[in-house]
Amino acid sequence: MRLLFFIFILSLSLTSVAQQKMPVAGIDITGNSKTKDYIILRELPFVKGDSLEAKQLAPAIIQAKQLLMNTQLFVDVQIDTLANDGQWQIRIQVKERWYLLPLPYFRLVDRNFNQWWVDQNRSLDRVNYGMKFIQNNVSGRNDNLNVWLITGYNRQFSARYTIPFIDKKLTKGFSVGFLHATQKELNIATAGNKQVFLRHSSDARKTWRIDASYSYRPDRFKRTTIRLSYFNETIADTILIVQKNYYPGQTNRQAALDISYRYQYINVSNITYPTSGYYSDLFLLKRVASRAQSIFQISARQLYAKKLSTKSFLLLDATAAYKSPIDSVFSNSRLIGYGGMQLRGLEYYVVDGTAGIVSRNAFHFNVKNFTLTNPVPIKNHEKIPIRLYLKMFADAGYAYHKYAGRSNSLSNTLLYTYGAGIDLVSVYDFVFRVEYSRNQLGREGLYLQGEFNF
């Protein structure tokens, strides 16, 4: 009887503690040899002095870890809490990434691996190579300096410096960049729903560009970016003979000022491979040039990831785009198959248009998590975590083109694909995808995709 009475009193005490609001007395951070403390503190959904119940603190800790990992500064984040004398003590331990990365560069010039392997006969001539000099977190404020020296099929020199916060409130930032590039071959048309290329003996296109942007991030989830970019492009005269409508005004040169606005809302578990949360992106671009060359573009993306269980989640991802004028020239009418508007199962095809939408939907199931021991013992990288997901997907899309032509039958047609695959997810936002899919043309195949965030 005494034992039951003791358990009853103890349970009441624990319930009282759980419901009691206690102040955050301190936040201790370790492991950040380069990153400034205030950059880490800025991402937390709580500050020193906040009064929180235990039931409020638990989800806040989960969100804090997600926000810190989404800075892409760390390979791991651990957060512990201690209740002592009616106060919370928060302990954050981070493992920093490599920030100085002189890396060899090797990349196919084609849109994806399968197009290079099949349509381009695995030609090693269609490869860009060189060096990427990447200094992330230059001053410990998550600022980045990138210098690319690329040669091979195309040549490119580019440099960019980005700093997210330049003010005391840690809300305003800027970026500046420069690019000079030349191409030996140019995609001049679409025929049979595939890209048509024309190679030039010297340079098919020359480009140089300078840009500057201002960013504003008032809280942990909202981001606004305004960018000014001036560019000058010239294509070879022989290109103009074959494709006179490559640029507006049937000219071989285009010089203009691009003014763009982007709004993002990012509240996902992982910015590279979200398993829960929301992501919204609105992008507007106005090209200021002569009347013949002025264009306007708008695109919007909405992603929703819903956790169904501890091992499964549903991912819904839709993107819509519109380009004006509606009868744009070829260089402004590439749509599905380019950039973020991709349909799994149509890797060999492109769909031109000036307005369109893509919907990508998938069910994912986590089948295995394991850790590999790094054969080369390196600080903060002794272990390599691996996650494997099985997935089933169904995609759909539509692209409107005023002058599609009979050979490009996928324009002005409802598109759909479906299939299954497996994703491998690891450190440095590495994602490798193996997918078997079938499209509405009745064609099916195995497709490989890889992403590495360096």
Where are these regions (language model features)?
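C-terminal outer-membrane beta-barrel translocator/porin domains of Gram-negative envelope proteins
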Residues: 256-383
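Short glycine-rich beta-strand segments
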Residues: 179-183, 231-233, 283-289, 321-325, ...
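Periplasmic polypeptide-binding modules associated with outer-membrane biogenesis and secretion
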Residues: 19-112, 132, 146-165, 298-301, ...
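Gram-negative/organellar outer-membrane beta-barrel architecture
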Residues: 97-260, 265-268, 278, 335-341, ...
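Outer-membrane beta-barrel transmembrane domain signature
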Residues: 362-372, 376, 381-419
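Bacterial Sec-dependent N-terminal signal peptides
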Residues: 1-23, 454
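A short beta-strand motif that forms the metal-chelation/ATP-contact edge
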Residues: 89-94, 390, 446-450
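Coil residues (strongly favoring Ser/Thr
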Residues: 51, 81, 237-238, 328
